[in-house]
Amino acid sequence: QKQLIAWAKNRVSHGGAGIKIRLVKGANLAMEKVDAELHGWPQAPYPTKEEVDANYKRMLHEGCRPENAKFVRLGVASHNLFDLAYAQLLRTREGVENRVEFEMLEGMANHQARVVNEAAGGLLLYAPVVNRGDFHNAIAYLVRRLDENTVPENFLHDLFGMTPGDAAWEAQRQRFLRACSLRDRVSADPRRTQNRATESIKLLPPDAPFRNEPDTDWALPHNVAWIREKVAAMRAVPMAEVPAAGEAEVESALQTVANAQAAWRALGFTGRATLLRQVAAGLARHRGGLIATMVSDAGKAVGEADSEVSEAIDFANFYARGFADPAFFDGSNFEPLGTVAVVPPWNFPLAIP
């Protein structure tokens, strides 16, 4: 918010127009949780509603400061009457009524919207607009908003059965007061801080539970700078020159593999599991170079190559963990298969052996 305000001030100083910031909370939280879980990242929004509410009020105060409101109009989007009343009093106290407006959704609590419109002297009402044949999309939109706003902690959950002074009202009042008390203490630091350039990769212990390897968070500028450097360096590397092998070279390679079988057998399951964990750690340490190589050699996009590195690490850790699982050996007899050729497909050169 502060960065946007500073940008808006600079824009106006150069003859441009101001901007508007809409303060809204709770929207698309389910999607944020799914996205974080799929990629192995911390959830970007605050983990608790109390923290979200506290930060909302902090942003409201920042937006209502006259020196900021002059350049940035503020939209207070909420159905929580406590928040709306708070914003109404705050904008009046700061003398910025004409720079702060209230916003609500059509179909959520229309009787409440009418009262807010009268008390605030105006209201921006949002409604989905679709062709008649696409009406189901409008219903889906409202159902999603209803789902987001009617979880037990939310104001709308209690709105229709709540009266001032009853238990539900008091619970909402206490939530509001706790958020106010945390306004200046809630963290403003980003929750996603992954840094591929400085991360430390450690070998997992044998008893570590299996967890999917996190993908690279490309929303973080330092990660983008990291991979740009890796890809640029790879462009200066000439493609490998591979001599054509003849029958003698093939026989030599096969003999080398055959000679190594005794050492591989001597490792046992514990040794092989350790080796696989070392492979996983090595892949993680060389993620940038592997991505750049796949981009250069196989024409993969950076995002796809990054996910493939994560998948390769997962394979190594998963099978290493499997050696410690009693079910892996249940009723099985293991016999050496001999020499096996591993030829990965062109489109998954790393993760699929």
Question: Which residues make up each language-model segment?
Answer:
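Conserved short loop/turn motifs at secondary-structure junctions
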Residues: 1, 78-79, 102-105, 276-281, ...
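Positively charged, amphipathic and often flexible ligand-engagement surfaces
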Residues: 1-205
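Short alpha-helical
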Residues: 82, 111, 289, 311, ...
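Charged, low-complexity surface patches
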Residues: 105-106, 135, 283, 305, ...
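Terminal low-complexity tails and localization/encapsulation signals of metabolic enzymes
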Residues: 121, 132-281, 285, 292-293, ...
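Conserved coil-to-alpha-helix start sites within the AMP-binding
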Residues: 345-353
